Structures are given as structure tokens and as C-alpha cells.
């Protein structure tokens, strides 16, 4: 009888330990939170994608190409570059229905904006879509074009003059400047 109570106690203690560890994983992002998130993201993002040598998202079957608008004074053009904050690493993925009149410009083409943005390397959300959306909602612009060229985990040296990411970014800006003025 006493052996039975000890075994029951250990089973209950183990269940409680697992339960509280599970709470810690969810609340405090303990291991294996990152592993679980990566597996979850594999199933959430169901599209055909292509990346370039910098790891930037250059094609996604989820992105719908549209005609690029002509530049005018009610068209905003925002450029985002740098590390993770501009590289599709934020938690919230914006969908087209959340971003009215927000356009993702990449490689001379325009797409209905949605997360992750073409031109950056992550597979999640970013801040630039929300900023563009607020500019449209407040009536500052009728439409906003966003250009994202962020690469997460890069050093400042890589973005410095003469280095690989600097050359890539200059090419992005040169391409953009043929059609638009950055506002």
C-alpha cells in the first residue's frame, strides 16, 4: 500500500513538473520554444519561395504582382534596411486585408504588401507595413510603397562602403530611384 502511494506521488509530481515547465516554455520562452516556433512556422507559411545569395526573399507564390503606381505627391515611398527589425523577424505577419493601399516594391515590380516582405531575409513580420498603413489611414498619403532590404544578424561593417550589403543596397536604391522619389 505504501509503495503504491509513493509511486502515485511521483507520477503526480512528474505531471506537475511537466505542466509548470510547459507554462515556462510558453510564458518565458524556455527551451524548446524556438524549436517549436520554427516547426510551427514551417506549417504556417505554405507557399513556393525563392531566396537570393543574401538570403533575401525574392519570390513567394503568396505575393500578388500589381501595376506600379505613378509617382505623385500623395504617394509615399519608404525604405527600410539594416538588421532584424527591418528584416521580417517581428512576430505579427500582416495580411493584405490589414494593409489597404500599401505596396511592396521589389526588383522593379510592385506587389500587394503582406508579410514577409519581398526584399528582406526573414520569414515573419516587420514594422514598415504598420507604419505605411498608418500613413494611409491618417490621410498623409493615398498609397505607400515600401522597400525592405533588411538582413538579420549582419554586422555594420557589411553595410559599410565597398562591402557586399552596401553594394546590394545601393543597387536597390538606384533601381527604386528610376521610378520614385523616397519620401
Please place each PLM-identified region on the residue numbering:
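Conserved SGNH/GDSL esterase-like catalytic core that processes O-acyl groups on lipids
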Residues: 111-182
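N-terminal secretory targeting modules
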Residues: 1-127, 138
Amino acid at each position: 500500500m505504501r509503495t503504491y502511494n509513493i509511486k502515485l506521488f511521483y507520477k503526480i509530481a512528474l505531471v506537475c513538473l511537466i505542466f509548470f515547465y510547459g507554462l515556462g516554455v510558453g510564458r518565458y520562452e524556455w527551451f524548446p520554444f524556438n524549436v517549436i516556433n520554427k516547426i510551427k512556422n514551417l506549417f504556417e507559411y505554405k507557399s513556393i519561395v525563392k531566396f537570393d545569395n543574401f538570403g533575401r526573399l525574392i519570390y513567394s507564390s503568396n505575393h500578388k504582382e500589381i501595376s506600379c503606381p505613378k509617382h505623385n505627391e500623395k504617394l509615399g515611398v519608404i525604405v527600410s534596411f539594416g538588421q532584424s527589425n527591418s528584416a521580417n523577424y517581428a512576430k505579427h505577419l500582416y495580411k493584405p486585408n490589414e494593409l489597404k493601399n500599401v505596396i511592396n516594391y521589389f526588383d522593379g515590380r510592385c506587389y500587394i504588401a503582406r508579410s514577409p516582405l519581398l526584399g528582406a531575409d526573414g520569414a515573419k513580420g516587420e514594422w514598415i507595413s504598420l507604419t505605411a498603413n498608418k500613413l494611409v489611414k491618417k490621410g498623409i498619403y493615398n498609397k505607400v510603397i515600401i522597400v525592405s532590404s533588411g538582413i538579420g544578424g549582419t554586422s555594420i561593417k557589411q553595410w559599410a562602403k565597398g562591402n557586399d550589403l552596401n553594394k546590394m543596397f545601393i543597387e536597390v536604391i538606384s533601381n527604386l530611384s528610376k521610378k520614385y522619389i523616397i519620401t
